[in-house]
Regions:
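P-loop (Walker A) phosphate-binding loop of NTP-binding proteins
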Residues: 1
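A conserved segment at the C-terminal end of the G1
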Residues: 7-19
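PAPS-dependent sulfation machinery
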Residues: 21-102
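Short, flexible helix/strand-to-coil boundary loops that buttress conserved ligand/catalytic motifs
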Residues: 23, 32, 137-138, 207, ...
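Anion-recognition interface
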Residues: 45-62, 82, 102-103, 108-114, ...
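PAPS-dependent sulfotransferase catalytic domain
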Residues: 77-90, 94, 108-109, 117, ...
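PAPS-dependent sulfotransferases, especially Golgi type II membrane carbohydrate sulfotransferases
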Residues: 168, 201-318
């Protein structure tokens, strides 16, 4: 989930010489974005055109010519697994760390698929109190359009409720590590040491600075990551969320919060005015679900040109 503390964790891990953590990018993974198999030289040119038309990937500062040459050295067909390995190798060519980490929080919902593509990979998930996540989201503005990352709390709470089904369905294993953000803030050194052991990394540090890799247009989202974690901000949500926001989140995700050791806060009964706001949250959420369903259904019943129009105009509101 956005604003869960993953950039702080990326900065802390990047301090170690064995580890390289990438920026996020909209890659053709066939999971979150349209996939693409590379089976010819023409496909390489097409994938390069696609990658270098994406601002997030351009921020990786990988030379197009160099990347093309590396892809030509790779056996066809090249799927997402092979492509990502080449991209990370090129991205960290100067540092040459032995552990390469691709940062993408949304992959938590697709672990089974990713395990098939990367059977030897390890996964790190950072868990944070959803009340704090939402509080941070509503104060942060997306770099692509300047809008708040969140404007009402139901989506954050609903996503948080999916975590037990996603995390706990995995059998006991040595490839998934769940780290609580609050533990990272309060006992960072010990938590990082445990994580290094999980990754098989040494404790040797480097002078690398993850903040320097972040594109200028995104730096405002991560202004504090160079500073030590602020323990006084861990529960700032308790004073900054409105009562309606707090009640909404706890009504939806209360069981999941307590399941992961987070205490619920007692609140007074909502006033009539606050109840109206609560109702509007649900009305807005229902409208969002209807629009999503309309986009999906139109794909099967409308001509392609009409579907693309519906997708373009309704997806703005999803």
């Amino acid at each position: 989930m956005s604003r869960s503390g993953s950039t702080l964790l990326a900065r802390l891990l990047s301090e170690y010489s064995d580890i390289g953590v990438s920026l996020e990018a909209d890659l053709p993974d066939g999971i979150l974005h349209e996939g693409m198999h590379i089976e010819s030289v023409d496909d390489i040119h097409a994938i390069l055109d696609r990658l270098y038309s994406n601002a997030k990937f351009v921020a990786w500062n990988i030379g197009r010519k160099s990347l093309g040459e590396e892809l030509l050295k790779t056996d066809f067909p090249i799927g997402f697994g092979g492509l990502l390995n080449v991209l990370l190798s090129e991205y960290f060519k100067k540092e040459n760390p032995k552990i390469l980490i691709y940062k993408c929080g949304e992959y938590i919902w697709h672990i089974d698929t990713l395990r098939k593509i990367f059977p030897d990979a390890k996964f790190i998930f950072i868990l944070r109190d959803v009340r704090a996540v939402y509080n941070s989201q509503k104060a942060a503005y997306r770099s692509k359009d300047g809008k708040p990352m969140a404007s009402y709390p139901i989506i954050a709470a609903a996503l948080f409720n999916r975590l037990p089904l996603t995390i706990e369905k995995q059998p006991e294993n040595d490839w998934l590590y769940v780290l609580k953000y609050e533990d990272l803030v309060s006992n960072g050194e010990n938590e990082i040491i445990k994580l290094l052991y999980f990754l098989g990394s040494s404790t040797k540090k480097t002078r690398g600075d993850y903040y320097d890799r972040i594109p200028l247009e995104q730096k405002h989202l991560h202004a504090n990551i160079r500073n030590p974690p602020q323990e006084n901000r861990v529960r700032a949500w308790q004073y900054e969320l409105t009562k309606t926001e707090l009640v909404t989140i706890q009504n939806i995700a209360g069981d999941t919060l307590t399941r992961y050791g987070y205490e619920l806060v007692e609140t007074e009964r909502l006033s009539f005015k606050e109840g109206i706001v609560y109702f509007m949250y649900w009305a807005k959420y229902l409208g969002r679900l209807i629009r999503k369903m309309a986009v999906k259904v139109s794909r099967f019943i409308l001509p392609e040109a009409w579907y693309l129009w519906v997708e373009k105009h309704l997806s703005v509101y999803l």
